[in-house]
Amino acid sequence: MSWSLCSTHGVSSSIALTYGFRHRRRSTFRIFATSDGLEPKDDPPESPLPSSSSALGKDLKKVVNKTAATFAPRASTASKNPALPGTTLYKVFEVQGYASMFLGGVLSFNLLFPSSEPDLWRLMGMWSIWMFTIPSLRARDCPSKEKEALNYLFLIVPLLNVAIPFFWKSFALVWSADTVAFFAMYAWKLGWLERTE
């Protein structure tokens, strides 16, 4: 039996999976991925800007959303998200997300289960934002700007966690960089620093 992955031309978000046995007919399946099992919703049309940076921003947003929709945890059924704002489940996910960020900091700074050697606890602390905080916050039914910020973070944090140790081997520094990236992305996407008049 042989398996091969090949991309199809003309279909942007699908993969053709081909398998076959010797001396038998080959079959091809197309697999389509969406963020939550539903067809993707179109964003409201934005005013066209002549600059190339807006086109680049749109393309980047599209790639990030597609990648996060493919690899980030999501609902397995096509049901409405029960973690709506104001519900207990929404609060549970929110508290879980920020508590795991805090606990990750405590672990990566070697305050809980201290050791003089690198160990699993410090490693878990370093990766806590990517493993627990971002998925917990993405599980809520949050506004589209916040979901977009979390999609970007889902891709940026692993890059930071892998790249920083090449230059400075510190669990605390990696966790700190992840935290700065987290709040900087929220500030950028949610407009925390914009002036209101």
Swiss-Prot record:
<dbReference type="GO" id="GO:0006952">
    <property type="term" value="P:defense response"/>
</dbReference>
<protein>
    <recommendedName>
        <fullName>Protein RESISTANCE TO PHYTOPHTHORA 1, chloroplastic</fullName>
    </recommendedName>
</protein>
<keyword id="KW-0809">Transit peptide</keyword>
<keyword id="KW-0150">Chloroplast</keyword>
<dbReference type="GO" id="GO:0016020">
    <property type="term" value="C:membrane"/>
</dbReference>
<keyword id="KW-0934">Plastid</keyword>
<comment type="function">
    <text>Plays a positive role in the immune response to the oomycetes P.brassicae, including induced oxidative burst (e.g. H(2)O(2)) and enhanced expression of defense-related genes.</text>
</comment>
<dbReference type="GO" id="GO:0050665">
    <property type="term" value="P:hydrogen peroxide biosynthetic process"/>
</dbReference>
<feature type="transmembrane region" description="Helical">
    <location>
        <begin position="173"/>
        <end position="193"/>
    </location>
</feature>
<feature type="transmembrane region" description="Helical">
    <location>
        <begin position="120"/>
        <end position="140"/>
    </location>
</feature>
<feature type="transit peptide" description="Chloroplast">
    <location>
        <begin position="1"/>
        <end position="52"/>
    </location>
</feature>
<dbReference type="GO" id="GO:1902290">
    <property type="term" value="P:positive regulation of defense response to oomycetes"/>
</dbReference>
<keyword id="KW-0472">Membrane</keyword>
<feature type="transmembrane region" description="Helical">
    <location>
        <begin position="93"/>
        <end position="113"/>
    </location>
</feature>
<keyword id="KW-0611">Plant defense</keyword>
<keyword id="KW-0812">Transmembrane</keyword>
<feature type="transmembrane region" description="Helical">
    <location>
        <begin position="150"/>
        <end position="170"/>
    </location>
</feature>
<keyword id="KW-1133">Transmembrane helix</keyword>
<dbReference type="GO" id="GO:0009507">
    <property type="term" value="C:chloroplast"/>
</dbReference>
<feature type="region of interest" description="Disordered">
    <location>
        <begin position="35"/>
        <end position="56"/>
    </location>
</feature>
<dbReference type="InterPro" id="IPR044966">
    <property type="entry name" value="RPH1"/>
</dbReference>
